[in-house]
Regions:
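A short, Lys/Arg-rich alpha-helix, primarily the initiator
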Residues: 3, 7-42, 52
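DNA major-groove recognition helix of helix-turn-helix/homeodomain DNA-binding modules
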Residues: 73-88
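Residue-level "edge-of-site" marker
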Residues: 63, 76, 91-92
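Short alpha-helical DNA-recognition segment
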Residues: 41-65, 81
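Short, Lys/Arg-enriched C-terminal cap helix and immediately downstream tail that follows
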Residues: 39, 72-73
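Positions in alpha-helical segments
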Residues: 34, 58-61, 73
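Short amphipathic recognition helices of helix-turn-helix/homeodomain-type DNA-binding modules
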Residues: 88-99
Length: 99
């Protein structure tokens, strides 16, 4: 049975996005990590923010330190949580506004 509305595990609709679950990030992972840390802000711990995003504290720490490449699923969750564009999260360009 084919579902016409594909969704990620956390129920965010893909809306026609045809990209592998892991994207090729050409930007500096440390810079991406700094932007993820900026989105988390000072009011949430890594454990709390990880629960919101559906990842563990250790994995979130790896993303923030630039030791792990963020998945498309994580980028979509960051966008949904923060309203920041995926372009800004990945490249730092295009402003942090909504897409």
């Amino acid at each position: 049975m084919r579902n016409s509305s594909r969704r990620l595990k956390n129920n965010i609709p893909l809306k026609g996005i045809h990209i592998k679950r892991h994207i090729q990030v050409r930007s500096d992972l440390k810079a991406i990590g700094r932007r993820i840390r900026e989105i988390r802000g000072f009011d949430l711990t890594q454990a709390e923010f990880g629960r919101i995003l559906g990842v563990g504290q250790t994995q979130l720490s790896k993303y923030e330190m630039g030791h792990s490449e963020p998945t498309l699923e994580l980028l979509l969750r960051l966008r949904a949580h923060s309203g920041r564009s995926i372009d800004w999260i990945v490249t730092g360009e295009g402003g942090p506004g909504k897409t």
